[in-house]
Amino acid sequence: MSSVEAVTQQQLLAAENPVRMGKGAADPRRAALGEITNRNAAAAANRKMGPSKKQPKPSCAQKPQPVVHTSAGDPAPISADMSMKVEQDLSQAFSEVLMLAVQDVDEQDADQPQLCSQYVKDIYKYLHTLEEQQAIRPNYMQGYSVTEHMRALLVDWLVQVHSRFQLLQETLYLTVAILDRFLQVHPVSRRKLQLVGVTAMLVACKYEEMYPPEVGDFAYITDDAFTKFQIVEMEQVILRSLGFQLGRPLPLHFLRRASKVADADVEKHTLAKYLLELTLLDYHMVHYRPSEAAAAALCLSQLLLDGLPWSLEQQHYSTYDEQHLKPIMQLMAKNVVQVTEGRTKFLAVKKKYSSSKLMKISLIPQLNSSTIKVMAEALQNP
């Protein structure tokens, strides 16, 4: 779903507002009331006055003007206008050099209309705006009866339900996004937390899936702890609380874009997906924007697998430099260490990514390396 517009915004503006060249480039500006006088009357008045008296010719003998001699080494004086023009030319040249340093990753996609190469820059600019509008506050459950441990338990169970129903990856991320967005504006009791979670997945399925499971399937998956009527009733509460705004950008959208920019292989992309999915259980990462999480996941993935730094192209297209992503990468490293060393009982994501279908990415030795351990320890010893 990713690609960048082949026509820049400046070119679009130039096409819509072409600059006139030649004589018509700038219309003569008339003085106030200067062109609404009677020109014929003015000409007649001049005729009445008669011919003007001839002015005496100036004498041929002119007073000699002093000549200023400048040495060859003295620079010629530069006017203010010329100086400003030089600065503008230098600034434009510098900008062009920067643009040349960044490769256009979508220039080869013009013949593939499904990649929207002409609009992809505007699309991702809009997604960045949208994720800010639908942000999640840090520590939003402060003062709730529901704890971060209960939330992690619920999300771990939802990962298993997601695998059981064989749903799309987008459905899982949207489920957790709906859960957090709803809980931050509508606190619930512990008894209803699972009801909110399973209903959030129902709403996400209706939004993402072609053939979503039925309400009865979700009632069954809870061992009939909740009835179909309760699930439908909670669905209405969730939708009203969110104002029916479900189109929050997902980390997967930005990860696919980032992988295209980096020309990442399947292993790097899959490892980044694993790192991203582990963040779903981490309550202390809910406030990070999806674009930030996706960029940090790929940055950590390529660092672990190939030791590659965050490139200029990746910084340009993601809008984040490596220094900005570092604290997010440290939190991701902490999650990996906890799962790898068995410090947590929430292992649904690790088990999911230990399958051959997902390249057994959660079992690779790089996740137990000194690199990731040092990064995780940096949180304890900043």
Swiss-Prot record:
Residues 1-12 have a biased composition (Polar residues). Residues 38-47 have a biased composition (Low complexity). One of its GO terms (molecular function) is cyclin-dependent protein serine/threonine kinase regulator activity. The keyword Cell division applies. SMART domains: CYCLIN, Cyclin_C. Transmembrane segments: none annotated. Pfam families: Cyclin_C (PF02984), Cyclin_N (PF00134). Essential for the control of the cell cycle at the G2/M (mitosis) transition. Interacts with the CDK1 protein kinase to form a serine/threonine kinase holoenzyme complex also known as maturation promoting factor (MPF). The cyclin subunit imparts substrate specificity to the complex. Belongs to the cyclin family. Cyclin AB subfamily. This is G2/mitotic-specific cyclin-B2. It comes from Oryzias javanicus. The lineage of its organism: Eukaryota, Metazoa, Chordata, Craniata, Vertebrata.
